[in-house]
């Protein structure tokens, strides 16, 4: 059993004793801490908190515990039940609520679940707020409501429709062009909430031919739910059979978007944003943001339009903060998560799909041909395992000194930008490891520079 508490929420495997896994006792404690914080920080004239969940088997149980706890803390609960992460984020602002709790472990296997915490803007708590939730939970500084001040409960299942309406209302979503293109689309929704909302979105976009794979929201994931090539053999084979022009694959909570070309080849998750950004910048030039571990291709496309690209620390809340600071028109937290402020400040696969199909319809190209128009980059992901007594920060400082003549960014670990490649080193908060991400114009070159830096780290660790 596993239970992980961090500034971004609490996640774990279902079952076990107190503190061993994600069980009702820990859920009550953490929900109470969040409810206490929001009571202090919310500036909205509201007593509502929204709760939404993905289709995990444990979702109903976890939701019932969360809802009861919030009501016990005096909050009025709006239960939108089976809903994507971006749907829940939008529901918070549409309801004028003080916050929201999303019950999803994202791309983790079915035995996992988690509580992700939102503020009154439908955005994730920042590090300071997350730490305060952890402190309150540890100190058990809770004050439950008396019998005359218990919260109320309301179920509202209209938010999937409202989410789709908001996507179709975006200026750059060209429904008529998509209809005329007569696209054939395949989807893999890993038997979670994407299976509820994506078919409806595509129908509303005028896509008449949809091949549906794993769209029953049972929570029994038919493959590892992380949308990586090694997990997507079924839909890739379907595409190789010529069944569709493009395939869209989402994770269980529908904030990540991966795509597959008409020939069965992965489009590349990093290029989801690059392509959508190209379309957005063409029509509404502006700045862009992604995290330090994301492809350089976004920078290249942004500069093509004479605009400025900025990199943030890893983590959606950091990307959003940087986007607001730079007035960015589009951004991403990596892994195919498109953040489009014209809709809302959160990763949203529905927005990504609608903008991508609009772009594809305007370009009149095959998906593989469109992909070939962007700069070719390849990212290698590795790690260096160290012993617990080693000072990881000291090693990173030495690496920074060794490469001081290169362009260095140290807002989140150490990123070394060479002329034609980069390496990003990040320490883990929970393990004695350094994650090593590297990018170059070929996978061989990316692996080579990554290995070179790993050799330096291992030498420094002796």
Which ranges hold each PLM region?
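N-terminal small/polar loop signature for handling phosphorylated ligands or for N-terminal nucleophile
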Residues: 36, 48-112, 200-260
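Phosphate-binding and adjacent anionic-ligand microenvironments
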Residues: 244, 284-462
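Gly/Ser/Thr-enriched, mixed-charge loops and adjacent short helices
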Residues: 13, 113-240
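Proline/glycine-rich low-complexity loops and linkers
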Residues: 131-165, 169, 261-334, 339
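An N-terminal, well-structured beta->alpha segment
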Residues: 1-68, 72-73, 152-184
């Amino acid at each position: 059993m596993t239970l992980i508490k961090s500034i971004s929420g609490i996640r774990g495997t279902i079952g076990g004793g107190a503190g061993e896994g994600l069980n009702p006792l820990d859920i009550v404690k953490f929900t109470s801490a969040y409810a206490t914080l929001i009571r202090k920080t919310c500036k909205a004239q509201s007593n509502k908190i929204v709760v939404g969940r993905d289709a995990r088997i444990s979702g109903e149980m976890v939701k019932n515990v969360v809802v009861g706890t919030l009501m016990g803390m005096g909050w009025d609960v709006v239960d939108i039940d089976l809903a994507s992460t971006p749907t829940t984020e939008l529901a918070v602002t549409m309801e004028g609520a003080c916050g929201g709790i999303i019950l999803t472990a994202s791309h983790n296997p079915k035995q996992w679940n988690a509580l992700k915490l939102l503020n009154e803007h439908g955005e994730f708590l920042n590090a300071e707020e997350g730490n305060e939730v952890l402190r309150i939970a540890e100190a058990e500084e809770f004050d439950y409501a008396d019998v005359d001040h218990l919260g109320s409960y309301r179920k509202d299942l209209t938010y999937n429709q409202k989410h789709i309406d908001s996507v179709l209302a975006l200026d750059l979503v060209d429904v008529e062009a998509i209809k005329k293109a007569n696209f054939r689309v395949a989807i893999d929704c890993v038997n979670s909430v994407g299976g509820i909302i994506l078919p409806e979105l595509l129908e509303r976009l005028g896509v008449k031919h949809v091949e549906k794979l794993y769209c029953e929201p049972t929570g029994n994931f038919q493959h590892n739910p992380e949308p990586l090539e090694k997990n997507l053999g079924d839909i890739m084979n379907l595409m190789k059979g010529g069944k569709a022009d493009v395939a869209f694959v989402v994770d269980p909570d529908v904030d990540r978007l991966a795509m597959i070309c008409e020939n069965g080849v992965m489009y590349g998750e990093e290029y989801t944003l690059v392509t959508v950004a190209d379309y957005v910048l063409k029509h509404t030039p502006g700045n862009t943001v992604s995290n330090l571990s994301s492809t350089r291709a976004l920078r290249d496309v942004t500069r093509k339009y004479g605009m400025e690209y900025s990199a943030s620390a890893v983590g959606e809340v950091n990307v959003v903060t940087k986007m607001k600071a730079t007035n960015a028109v589009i951004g991403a937290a990596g892994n195919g998560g498109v953040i489009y402020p014209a809709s809302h400040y959160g990763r949203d696969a529905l927005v990504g799909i609608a903008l991508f199909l609009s772009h594809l319809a305007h370009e009149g190209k095959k998906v593989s041909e469109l992909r070939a128009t962007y700069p070719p980059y390849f990212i290698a992901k590795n790690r260096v395992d160290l012993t617990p007594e080693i000072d990881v920060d000291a090693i990173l400082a030495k690496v920074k000194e060794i490469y001081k003549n290169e362009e260095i960014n140290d807002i989140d670990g150490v990123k070394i930008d060479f002329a034609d490649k980069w390496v990003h080193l990040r320490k883990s908060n929970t393990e004695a490891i350094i994650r090593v991400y590297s990018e170059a114009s070929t996978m061989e070159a990316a692996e080579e520079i990554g290995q070179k830096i790993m050799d330096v780290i291992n030498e420094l660790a002796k």
